[in-house]
Regions:
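Generic hydrophobic, amphipathic alpha-helix propensity
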Residues: 21-33, 51, 76-84
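Helix-turn-helix
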Residues: 28, 36-71, 75
Length: 164
């Protein structure tokens, strides 16, 4: 017996597939920029054609995801910051004694750096160079990270008197 998809189900499946493809293209563009930076290119010198060629998409596809290369860079900073802060927050909430929690957090951080070395190469080079908007975004991510860590350490009373 053959099951027929209702007319309402088919467009939903197609829409979901389109959303997945769009997200995959966005990720490919971001990874392409990181790969090019990892190969020695300066992010600020990267062109849209160069990024899209590396990503395997046509140049017009870039504009469906980002208005400028700066916007792409901001997405890289944001994604990296959100992921790292989440991982470190989970590490700090692992109910470990103070010093063990710090060691675990450092271990998580080092593992993340090793697994995401291209992101960190990008962030470290753009932190002092590149565009003002990227420098500001990186500075904000560092401030978020520092504030979250200081707040958790204060709550654990590991460093009494630590201001947050």
């Amino acid at each position: 017996m053959r099951t027929r998809l209702s007319a309402a189900t088919k467009p939903v499946d197609e829409t979901q597939a389109r959303v997945r493809r769009k997200e995959q293209t966005r990720q490919n563009l971001m990874q392409a920029a990181l790969t090019l930076v990892g190969n020695g290119s300066s992010f600020t010198a990267l062109g849209i054609r160069e990024i899209t060629r590396e990503a395997g998409v046509v140049p017009t596809a870039f504009y469906r995801h980002f208005k400028t290369t700066d916007e792409l860079g901001l997405a890289l900073v944001e994604d990296g910051g959100i992921t790292l802060r989440r991982l470190l927050r989970e590490a700090r909430q692992a109910s470990l004694p103070g010093e063990d929690m710090i060691r675990h957090s450092v271990s998580v951080f080092v593992t993340y750096l090793k697994q995401h070395h291209l992101e960190w190469r990008f962030i470290s080079s753009e932190r002092s160079g590149g565009s003002q908007s990227l420098r500001n975004a990186i500075r904000n991510e560092i401030a978020h990270f520092t504030n979250e860590m200081a707040s958790d350490l204060r709550l654990l009373n590991i460093f009494p008197g630590l201001s947050t």
